[in-house]
Amino acid sequence: MKTNQSRRKFLGNAAVGASVAALTSPLHVEAAMVESNQQARNASQPRQGKPPMSVSSANGLAAVNKAVEVMRGGGDTLDAVIAGVNIVELDPKDNSVGYGGLPNERGDVELDASAMHGPTRRAGAVASIRGVRTPSKVARAVLEHTDHILIVGQGAREFATAHGFEDMNLLTEESRIAWLRWKETLSPVDKWGASPYTPAPASPAGQRRIAAERARPSYTLAENYANGDERRREELLAWADEVARKPPTGTINCLALDAASDISGVTTTSGLAWKIPGRVGDSPLIGCGLYVDNDTGAAGSTGRGEEVIYINGARSVVEYMRRGSSPEQACLDALKLIAARYGNDLEKLKDIDVNFYALNKRGEFAGAAIWSHTVTGRGELRRRQFAAHDGREGRLLESAYLFERKA
């Protein structure tokens, strides 16, 4: 299904230099003028809460509620964000983070995480770590118990073992079935799936079975391993088909501000599904998937990590806030850097999914995305959201965006 994507203009006059240079055609200029009034309204009334408060990605509603609970109980902001994301890391139903995360191309779950503590200005991170359900805690251990910032691969695994983290299998049935579905439908010429050299069946019933199997649109490995009643099997296989076609670019970022105006943040992920083993995205890279400046604010990201790395995304957002931008405008300006890399060409940008989240010292906060909606593997549009607890209640809010995607 072809999606009709119309331009929703950049929500701002204060574009960064690279973006301004790209906005030279009459179409770009006209659209910018149309949106300037809307941007002015948004800038005059930024979302604001009263600490303790927390901001997270859309899968972090439970995380922001937990973070505020921890801070109200006297916990530090780093305690708060780690406790918040642990809920999602341990949730097998979230296949973009921790336990149950979608694996790499070999079927191994590799996790990345970073943590930053505003009051001490320290950071810690791990990448490509296996066998630990809560990599955010290992990132914290790097922060607190070493003079390093980032430990990767087998070294990260050994460091985790030394600090008492049990080595566990992170694949759930669901993530394994999704990987099998992707693996067996990846190529018609590899060795996965039914053999084309099956001997001739000895009976008419056998011939009919072979003919039926070869007529199927896909192979049957996933079906063979899916457990449960018929309804559950159908739901699981439908989900596996969707994920195999369009893997989610999940992750969770969580930021927290306490009554003393101290800030901390964490980002944790299982990374890009079916990735080449050892691939590292933005989440564990300080300044990319997470950045905290206790004098200004904090930012984090989810989505396509390579795009965020190119622009040092989280650091860019915080720098825009340091220069006076609201959290929303700062997020949008960072997203404009990504759009500018592609000449603001919507056709090239249509499959790029990036979200930023920001929180400043005054309690102003925001979430913003390149596109107003994401497109699921079933072709359905889903409005971009983020989670926030403003000191009163936790809820999901609609994200600001650069471009509007319409059905």
How should each PLM-predicted stretch be described?
Residues 1-18:
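N-terminal secretory signal peptides and thylakoid transit peptides that target proteins
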Residues 376-392:
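Glycine-rich phosphate/cofactor-binding loops in nucleotide/flavin-utilizing enzymes
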Residues 41-373, 393-406:
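Proteins synthesized as precursors that undergo proteolytic processing into mature forms
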Residues 2, 35-36, 42:
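Intrinsic low-complexity/disordered segments
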Residues 26-38:
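Signal peptide processing junction and immediate N-terminal pro/mature segment
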